[in-house]
Amino acid sequence: MQIIKRLINKTVLLLTLIVMLSSVFSFQSVKAVSNSKTTEMIIHYKEKLGNTKDWNLWLWGENANGTSYEFTGEDEFGKYAKIKIDGDYNRVGFIVRTNEWEKDGGDRWIENIKDGRAEVWILSGDEKVYNSKPSSDLSIQKATIDSFHEITVTTNVPFNIKEKKIEIEGIKIKNITPYDINSGNITNKVKIITEQKIDLKQTYKVKIENLADTNTEIGQVIRSEEFDNLFYYGGNDLGNTYTPQHTKFRLWAPTASEAKLVTYKKWSDKIGAEINMQQGEKGTWTSELKGNQKGLFYTYKVKIGDKWTEAVDPYVRAASVNGDKGAVVNLEETNPKKWKANKKPKFKNPEDAIIYELHVRDLSIQSESGIKQKGKYLGVTEKGTKGPEGVKTGLDHIKDLGVTHVQFLPIFDYASVNEETLNEPQYNWGYDPKNFNVPEGSYSTNPYEPTVRITELKQMVQTLHDNNLRVVMDVVYNHMYNAAESNFHKLVPGYYYRYNEDGTFANGTGVGNDTASERKMMRKFMIDSVTYWAKEYNLDGFRFDLMGIHDYETMNEIRKAVNQIDPSIILHGEGWDLNTPLAAELKANQKNAEKMKGIAHFNDNIRDGLKGSVFEEKENGFINGKENMEDRIKKGITAGIDYDTNSSTYQDPEQVLTYVEAHDNHTLWDKLELTNPGDNDEVRKQMHKLSSSILLTSQGIPFLHAGQEFMRTKYGDHNSYKSPDSINQMDWLRRATFNNEVDYMKGLIELRKKYSAFRMTSAAQIKTQVSFIGAPKNTVAYTIEGNKNEYFTVAHNANREAVEITLPSKGPWKVLVDGKQAGSKPLYVVHDNKIKVPALSSFVLKLK
C-alpha cells in the first residue's frame, strides 16, 4: 500500500506536541494522524516475577511479513511498546519472544482495531489478549488437565488456599495442595487431585469462592505415557481412502468431543457441507461418502472444549492451491506413462553414493539455462539443453558430472510461497512445512489442479531414474511453519509438539517449535509419511533436516520400515545436538550415532576442519591457511571412526556424510573470499580444488552442493533461504567460465566410482587398509590397500609451496590426480620413491 507523504500543517504541529508530551502515556499520545493507510498499536506486557529474559515483539499485519519491535517504555502495569505499521489492518498478529526465538506463548492477535488504532494488555503465561487493563483483583487465569486425576489451577495473584472454597463441577476432589510444596498455603498455582478419572472429551468448570468460573483445558495429560497407551492407533487408513465406489475418511482426534467432515465442490468455496463423523476406536473419527468422490475438496472440524476449529487432514496426499484444503484423488491416475513402481538405477552400498544437493527452481530459472520449464519439476526432465558457449545445462550437466544421487531441497507442500501469484518472482528454500505428504505446488505447471503436481513430480523422478540418477528427498518433520495455526495443533492441541515447563513451545529448532517424535502418533506419522513417499514416488533416500530434534528410536523405526520397501534407500540427516526437552541419551544426534545403524550424519567436523567454522566467517581451515589441522583432516579422511565421545561415535563409514558446503551458510567460494581477501582467484581456485580432492578420496559418503563443481557463489549471502533468484540460481555463465574446474571435479568422481578403495564398507577395512605416512607440516599423506591388489598413495598439500613426499616404493606409479587434472586414467608415470606435490594441490598415485 502507498504511504501518504504529505501532511497538513496542523498535523505537523500535533506531531510536535506528541513528541513533547511523550512522557505522558495514554492513547492520546499515539493519536497522531487520522491515516487510514497505517495501523497504530500500544501493547502492554506484564512479565513473570523474577524474569531475566530480554523479551521483544515480533509483529505482522495479517498476511504480511513480520518485523521485530522493542518494548519502549514501562509503567505500573509493566512494559509497553508503541508501534505504527504501514497498512490498514483489521487483524495484527504478534509473538512475545527473545532474539533467539524463545517464546512467551504462541501467536496472539489484536482484533479490536478501530480507525487504525488499538490498545491491548497481555500477561506472561496467559494466551489471552485483553482489550482493557486486566484487574489486579484475584481471578483464575487457567485450569489445565495435567493427568487423568490431576487439574492445575493458576490465578493471577497468590491467595490462601485454606481461605477459599474450591470445587470442580461434575467431579469429586480428593485433595488440594500448592503446586510447589515449598510455597506454603499462599500460592497462585494449585494442584487438584480428583477421585474419578477425568474424561478428556468433557469440559469441567473450576470454581473458586467469589471468583468467576473457568473451564478446564487439556494440559500435560496429553503428553503422558498413559495417554499414548490409551489412544495409539496403529491402523493404515488415516486420511482418505479412495475407491471409485466410495471414499472413507479417518481422523485421529482423541480430545475432540465432536468431529465433522467438511466437503467443498471447488477449492475456492468459502462454505462447505458439514457431515458429522462417527467415533471410532482409539480416539479416531470416521466417515464414508458413497460414489466416486474424485476431485472433492475437504477439511475436518473438531470441537475441543467449547471451541470449534477447522484444519486440513494431516494425512492428506493431494491439496488445493496453497494447501488450504485437502483433495480426494485417484493416485493410480497420476502415474506417468511407463511408470514402474520399482524401476530404479542399480545401487549396492551406501558408500557408493555421491550426493548432489539441488533446489528445483535453482537448476532452470536463469535465462541462460536453455530450459523451457523454468523453476518447475518438468524443468529437471528436459534433455539436450545448452547454455553459454554450448555447455550442457540442467539434467545433462548433472548426468555428465557423474554423481549417483540428486538430493532435492524440500519438495513437499510448504507455506512460504504463494501459489496464486506465481507470475511474481518468489523464492524460498522450503523449510516451512504445511502439508507433509503433498508435493509443493509452485514447482508444478498448474497448482490449482491437485493431480498435476503429483504427476509432474513423478515424471521428474522417472526421468532421473532413466538417466541413472537416484533421488533423495529432504524432509522436515522437526517443526511446522506455524505451530499454533498448524493442522497438528488445531486437531489435537498440545500433543504433536514439545513444550517448555511454562507451557510455551520448545524451540530447539530455532524456528519457534519442535515436534515430538517420541510420542507414538507423531512417530507413526513420520514412519507413515516416509514410507508413503518411498512407495508412491519411488524415492531412493531421505535427508532429515535437524535430525537431532528427533529421537533415535523413531529414526531406527524409519530405517526398519524402508528396509522392507527397498534396503538400498539411504537415510541421513543433521545430527546436531540441539536444545530441545528430550533426554540426551534419546536424541538422534552424532553422539548417539552408535545407536542408529544405517543412518548417516553430516560431518561438520571435516567441514569446518577444511575451511574454518561456519559460525566464524573469517576463521580459516586446513585448505585456506590454518596450521596444525592435520589430525582433524586425517579423522575426516577415515570417516571419523576413531573420534572421541565429544565429537563423534561413528561406527561405520556408511554413517558419515563428508562435505564442505551445502545450501546453508556461505558457499566455499564465498568463504574463501572472506578468509583470504588478499589472495587472487587463481589461488582460491586451487584451495577449492584441494577441498574437492580431499572430499572425493575420503572414506564415507561424499556430498556436493549443486554448483560446487564450478565454485558456486551466492555473492556473500550466507542464508539465502528467501533471497532472489539472482542470488540462488545456478549460474550457467559461471559454469562456462570454470570449465577446467568442472572437468577436475568430474575426474575425481570418475576416480572414486572406479576404485572401491575410496569407498570401503566397514571400519575394520579402513583401520587395516588405510595407513598414514610421514609428510611435511600442513600436509596429509597416506596409502590405501584396495581390492584386486590395488595400491594407492594419496597426498594433500595445503602449503603455499611444493613439498616432497617419500613414497613406499619406486613404483612405477601411475599419477591419476596432480592438482591440475584428475581421472581414473594415468596422466603420466613416475619411476621414483619421491614426488613433488605442488602448492595447494593433491596427488593420487596408483602402483602399476
PLM region descriptions:
Residues R6-S29:
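Sec-dependent N-terminal signal peptides of Gram-positive bacterial secreted proteins and lipoproteins
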Residues V30-L49, G73-S147, K189, E195-K248, ...:
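The feature marks proteins involved in alpha-glucan
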Residues T39-M41, E76, G272-Q279, E424-P425, ...:
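Active-site-proximal helices and loops of the catalytic beta/alpha 8
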Residues L49-K53, Y89, T154-K162, W252-E258, ...:
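Short proline/glycine-enriched turn/loop motifs at strand-loop junctions of beta-rich domains
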Residues K53-N63, T152, N156-Y179, S257-G272:
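Short, surface-exposed alpha-helix to beta-strand junction/turn motifs within ectodomains of secreted
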Residues A253, K294-L296, Y828-K848:
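C-terminal beta-strand-rich structural cap/linker in extracellular carbohydrate-active enzymes
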Residues R361-Y537, M555-D566, I570:
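Substrate-binding/active-site clefts of carbohydrate-active enzymes
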Residues Q651-P812:
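Loop/helix patches that line or flank the sugar-binding groove of alpha-linked glycan CAZymes
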